């Protein structure tokens, strides 16, 4: 009998039961195998939830990105259960790469215990099991002789089968469930942790991630290590003595930080004043700056850094070098050297933006949000701000995040050109320099680094994190990045401030509609920094009303019959069976592809679009297509209609093209082809080509935010576009 036998005989749960059973059977005899299998069980469980919920799982999705997604956290609906999920994930990561003996029987027991309540709570939610018994420690084998499992899948082999297993599990669980639960009801964990157990499990894991070795001997002080139960003198009690749960010591045994831990059932804030007293006593005893203060209950950790910021929540602990820098920053002055380089930003509104952010940071705010219309120089403003912050000794290391590699590369080029004295690198570079002062990354790549077995970045690695196009979808999918890194935050968005959603303002600690500063489209047009757009509305009846077979010409009906024959075959009907239906407008170019409509749109573009070079050449154009198949059809029809313009005049640029970055570079060059880019999402945002003068919206746009981003592709100023002196 084992604890995980509660799911042993349930059809479809064989794989997850095996992972769980191995984790339980090897908990005492081989902790490394135990926690690895626990992590695999967790990943299978999470992917099963995604498939049951109908949520898409990205090809490169990591366990961190899946569990940090706001849909999943809302489903789990319990901070306690989420902490247990992340413990199993993290301890499994540690075991996969560490041979330092950190993972022992205590760690594996806690992983198995947490896994039991994670799986049990989710199975209860889907009514796969009726009750969840308390975890029975006595059922866990304490020797190899009592283990019933001898064959252990290798982690890499098991990992490869996880997705396939999750699909099978999702089907089985889905069939056995009466309804889709909105949320999980977390089950109470009977093994309430003592303060010491909290320290050895949650907190020790976080310290280990930050590179700290925890001494085993109470009261022992070792250079560059975390001492436990360190005696302090001068406390306001009868004996004048106290014992700090942890003290993090520098190489010369100067205390850099003190950690006060309370039971997991106690609010972390309960330890704040006690930690402050310990810090004061240590500063007096060692005649040193007051140590950085952490107070935690294992689930939640807060920091008082001594720089002047209010206490704040952090996701772990800082490294020894980060603590040294933090203490050194206490003497820094406000940002007063506001000398802004005209070489980088020479417009008054850009300088105002930089000054607004600096004033905001001087006021002890850690997060700033700028709303700037596309084409007004968001990236340049961020570069100038970095220049100012570095010069004022506020920032040393910077992380720039964007949602596509093309935008990352574009930003990297601009930073390298305008800040030549700072090292830059992209995490997507083959020769990436992890130690570069300014690192560039997509959100997806960074999430992958945070969920690696060996953690690439500590939480204090970056002093400033810049978010390109800060909006709700980014925070919903990749919020774990901004929760993890403990640095100043700068959000950039082209979304009009009244359209920015409340959750984005909440993330930056701001009132609705009140960003740090803004410079919007109408203002930029009035000032002459952007050009107004002229809309030509042209709807096809097919695109707005769909296709009614009874309203077609004989020739059109013949084309539609070919589609109906295909549908009959899929439906298992005989070729001669009668079949007809009305095609909805939403199916056009998603399923039904109409040549006549494509030809009409292309001819309209070539006849009415803005032309350059003395009106002899259609200007740079983006056609926004429904999907890849639609984009290919557009390019093919263009080649048929205008063969004299050559094969490269109109090209598809989307994520199906392996070397899309090269095509974008050619499109951005006024002297090179393509002249027309047919895009599926890739050119909707971020691409900086001032020569673009025509935008064809060949798909419905339901988001105002996305619409304004797309409009911004064609509103930039471009000198001499129509000839010398004609901008």
Which residues does each PLM region occupy?
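Amphipathic alpha-helical interface elements
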Residues: 1-156
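SF2 helicase catalytic motif II
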Residues: 455-491
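Interdomain helical connector at the RecA1-RecA2 junction of SF1/SF2 helicase-like NTPases
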Residues: 502-618
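Conserved C-terminal RecA-like helicase domain
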Residues: 437, 567-573, 578-679
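Conserved RecA-like ASCE P-loop NTPase motor core of nucleic-acid helicases/translocases
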Residues: 370, 396-404, 619-627
């Amino acid at each position: 009998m084992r604890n995980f036998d509660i799911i042993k005989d349930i059809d479809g749960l064989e794989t997850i039961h095996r992972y769980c059973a191995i984790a339980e059977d090897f908990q005492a005899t081989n902790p490394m195998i135990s926690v690895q299998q626990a992590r695999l069980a967790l990943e299978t469980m999470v992917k099963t939830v995604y498939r049951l919920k109908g949520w898409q799982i990205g090809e490169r999705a990591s366990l961190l990105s899946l569990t940090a997604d706001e849909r999943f956290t809302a489903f789990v609906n319990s901070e306690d259960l989420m902490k247990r999920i992340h413990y199993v994930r993290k301890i499994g990561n540690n075991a996969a790469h560490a041979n330092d003996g950190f993972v022992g029987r205590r760690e594996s027991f806690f992983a198995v215990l947490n896994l039991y309540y994670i799986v049990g709570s989710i199975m209860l939610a889907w009514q796969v099991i009726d009750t969840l018994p308390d975890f029975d420690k006595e059922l866990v084998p304490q020797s190899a002789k009592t283990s019933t499992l001898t064959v252990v899948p290798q982690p890499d082999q098991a990992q490869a089968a996880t997705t396939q297993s999750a699909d099978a599990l999702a089907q089985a669980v889905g069939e056995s469930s009466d309804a889709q639960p909105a949320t999980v009801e977390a089950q109470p964990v009977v093994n309430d942790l003592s303060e010491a157990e909290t320290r050895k499990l949650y907190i020790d894991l976080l310290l280990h991630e930050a590179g700290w070795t925890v001494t085993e001997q109470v009261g022992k002080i070792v250079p560059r290590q975390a001492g436990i139960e360190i005696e302090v003198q001068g406390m306001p009690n009868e004996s004048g003595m106290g014992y700090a749960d942890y003290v993090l010591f520098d190489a010369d045994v100067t205390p850099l930080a003190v950690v006060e831990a309370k039971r997991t059932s106690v609010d972390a804030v309960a330890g704040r004043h006690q930690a402050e007293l310990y810090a004061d006593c240590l500063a007096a005893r060692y005649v040193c700056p007051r140590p950085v203060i952490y107070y935690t209950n294992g689930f939640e950790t807060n920091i008082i850094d001594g720089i002047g910021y209010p206490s704040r929540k952090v996701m772990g602990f800082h490294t020894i070098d980060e603590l040294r820098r933090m203490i050194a920053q206490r003497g820094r002055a406000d940002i007063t050297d506001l000398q802004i380089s005209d070489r980088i930003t020479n417009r008054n509104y850009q300088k105002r933006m930089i000054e607004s952010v600096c004033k905001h940071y001087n006021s002890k705010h850690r997060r700033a949000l700028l709303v700037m219309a596309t084409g007004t120089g968001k990236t340049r403003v961020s570069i100038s701000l970095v220049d100012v912050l570095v010069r004022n000794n506020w920032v040393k290391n910077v992380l720039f995040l964007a949602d596509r590699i093309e935008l990352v590369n574009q930003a990297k080029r601009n930073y390298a050109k305008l800040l030549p004295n700072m090292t830059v690198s992209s995490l997507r570079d083959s020769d990436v320099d992890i130690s570069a002062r300014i690192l560039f990354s997509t959100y997806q790549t960074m999430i992958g680094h945070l969920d690696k077995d060996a953690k690439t970045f500590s939480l204090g690695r970056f002093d400033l994190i810049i978010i390109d196009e800060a909006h709700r979808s980014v925070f919903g999918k990749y919020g774990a990045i901004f929760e993890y890194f403990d640095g100043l935050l700068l959000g950039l968005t082209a979304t009009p401030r009244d359209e920015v959603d409340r959750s984005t303002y909440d993330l930056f600690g701001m009132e609705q509609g009140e960003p740090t500063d803004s410079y919007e489209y109408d203002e930029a047009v009035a000032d002459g920094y952007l050009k107004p757009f002229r809309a030509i509305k042209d709807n096809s009846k097919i695109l707005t009303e769909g296709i009614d077979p009874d309203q077609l010409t004989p020739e059109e009906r013949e084309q539609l019959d070919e589609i109906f024959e295909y549908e009959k075959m899929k439906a298992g009907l005989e070729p001669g069976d009668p079949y007809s239906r009305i095609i909805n407008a939403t199916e056009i170019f998603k399923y039904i592809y109409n040549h006549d409509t494509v030809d009409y749109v292309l001819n309209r573009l070539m006849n009415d679009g803005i032309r350059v070079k003395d009106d002899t050449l259609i200007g740079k154009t983006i056609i926004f297509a429904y999907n890849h198949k639609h984009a290919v059809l557009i390019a093919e029809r263009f080649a048929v209609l205008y063969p004299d313009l050559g094969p490269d005049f109109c090209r598809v640029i989307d994520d199906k093209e392996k070397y899309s970055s090269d095509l974008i570079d050619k499109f951005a060059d006024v002297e090179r082809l393509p002249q027309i880019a047919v895009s599926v999402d890739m050119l909707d945002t971020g691409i900086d080509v001032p020569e673009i003068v025509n935008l064809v919206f060949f798909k419905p746009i339901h988001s105002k935010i996305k619409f304004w981003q797309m409009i911004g592709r064609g509103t930039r100023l471009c000198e001499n576009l129509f000839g010398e002196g004609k901008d």
